[in-house]
């Protein structure tokens, strides 16, 4: 049965399922709460961590042990920057990890706040692939490419 209001959160969950993701590790935050709610309703198993670095390292562990992508889900700004150590380790070891970070509204990107960070640029040197989704229609493709 098709959902009446298919949201970006629904698309993320469907893409995770289609890529055999069993677990998502992360910390709720204002920019991603809608996705946490959707995961609790109909997603891979959600495991809340106490720090974003733990989420990245737990995702790496899943990737290493199963060969399936481990997923870390965090909010924008400091949430994303706290992933870097775990992502550097996963990248250097060749472990499959998908990091999903929230982002502020587009009109807030140029404001000087701790949440308004260029996430894709920040993670470019820590990962094999880093992108920011500008168009919801490309969300599934970007996630699958990662």
Protein language model features and the residues they cover:
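N-terminal alpha/beta PP-like core and its mobile active-site loop of ThDP/TPP-dependent enzymes
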Residues: 1-146
